[in-house]
Amino acid sequence: MKRLFLSIFLLGSCLALAACADQEANAEQPMPKAEQKKPEKKAVQVQKKEDDTSAWIKTEKPAKLPILMYHSISSGNSLRVPKKEFEAHMKWLHDNGYQTLTPKEASLMLTQDKKPSEKCVLITFDDGYTDNYQDAYPVLKKYGMKATIFMIGKSIGHKHHLTEEQMKEMAQHGISIESHTIDHLELNGLTPQQQQSEMADSKKLFDNMFHQQTTIISYPVGRYNEETLKAAEKTGYQMGVTTEPGAASRDQGMYALHRVRVSPGMSGSAFGAYIESMK
């Protein structure tokens, strides 16, 4: 009888041990794919295309656009505007409801006679000085403004000029880098072939550096001739800007657009009156 009980006890123990082992094995197995929790997909925000003008305001006459012309944000001569004055100008634009444009938006506004806001402006800087990054860029970010820097190709990374890294950082925050030619030569003193080379090489440089279609060129020192205008169109630009005074309009020709020179010594209110006079 004792032997029978002992046999039953041993048999039960073996069965219990087998069941435990089976449970442990199952616990170590991965969850079936159907039961695994899949990572949640993040919602993707689709940004409105830059060339979507469906909600823009139609103008009753050829659109006029003030294209502001700055150079260095410092002091010392008539091309330099101190940071304090520059900030006063940007604050005035912000407080008075002006929308700052990209070159692409400016091109659409001038060619389609439509505008994204009642008050628009294109802010530009010639030459690509380091202080555009150190002093202008923080102010532009503060007020949520776009701007365009016309960079000299050969000056990238040179003393007092922007580096590639600085330009790429700004390009991620609403600052467009566009063409001021390769060598900053007075174009009206060059042959047609030399002009084309200056423009084409600069466009290729910035197209590749920023994975973009470089849209606009600023002629060095404002010097140009009829061959310059032909070369700008032939090399693939959509616009060219000069130093001729006044607001831009397509009546001037898309490759001979005027600009509004901003000189030092202007308070915010004086700057505002100047801009309002361009209407």
UniProtKB/Swiss-Prot annotation:
<feature type="domain" description="NodB homology">
    <location>
        <begin position="119"/>
        <end position="279"/>
    </location>
</feature>
<dbReference type="InterPro" id="IPR051398">
    <property type="entry name" value="Polysacch_Deacetylase"/>
</dbReference>
<keyword id="KW-0449">Lipoprotein</keyword>
<feature type="signal peptide">
    <location>
        <begin position="1"/>
        <end position="19"/>
    </location>
</feature>
<keyword id="KW-0472">Membrane</keyword>
<feature type="compositionally biased region" description="Basic and acidic residues">
    <location>
        <begin position="34"/>
        <end position="51"/>
    </location>
</feature>
<dbReference type="InterPro" id="IPR002509">
    <property type="entry name" value="NODB_dom"/>
</dbReference>
<dbReference type="Pfam" id="PF01522">
    <property type="entry name" value="Polysacc_deac_1"/>
</dbReference>
<feature type="lipid moiety-binding region" description="N-palmitoyl cysteine">
    <location>
        <position position="20"/>
    </location>
</feature>
<keyword id="KW-1003">Cell membrane</keyword>
<dbReference type="GO" id="GO:0005975">
    <property type="term" value="P:carbohydrate metabolic process"/>
</dbReference>
<keyword id="KW-0564">Palmitate</keyword>
<dbReference type="GO" id="GO:0016810">
    <property type="term" value="F:hydrolase activity, acting on carbon-nitrogen (but not peptide) bonds"/>
</dbReference>
<keyword id="KW-0378">Hydrolase</keyword>
<comment type="similarity">
    <text>Belongs to the polysaccharide deacetylase family.</text>
</comment>
<keyword id="KW-0732">Signal</keyword>
<feature type="region of interest" description="Disordered">
    <location>
        <begin position="29"/>
        <end position="51"/>
    </location>
</feature>
<protein>
    <recommendedName>
        <fullName>Putative polysaccharide deacetylase YxkH</fullName>
        <ecNumber>3.-.-.-</ecNumber>
    </recommendedName>
</protein>
<dbReference type="InterPro" id="IPR011330">
    <property type="entry name" value="Glyco_hydro/deAcase_b/a-brl"/>
</dbReference>
<dbReference type="GO" id="GO:0005886">
    <property type="term" value="C:plasma membrane"/>
</dbReference>
<feature type="lipid moiety-binding region" description="S-diacylglycerol cysteine">
    <location>
        <position position="20"/>
    </location>
</feature>
<dbReference type="GO" id="GO:0016787">
    <property type="term" value="F:hydrolase activity"/>
</dbReference>
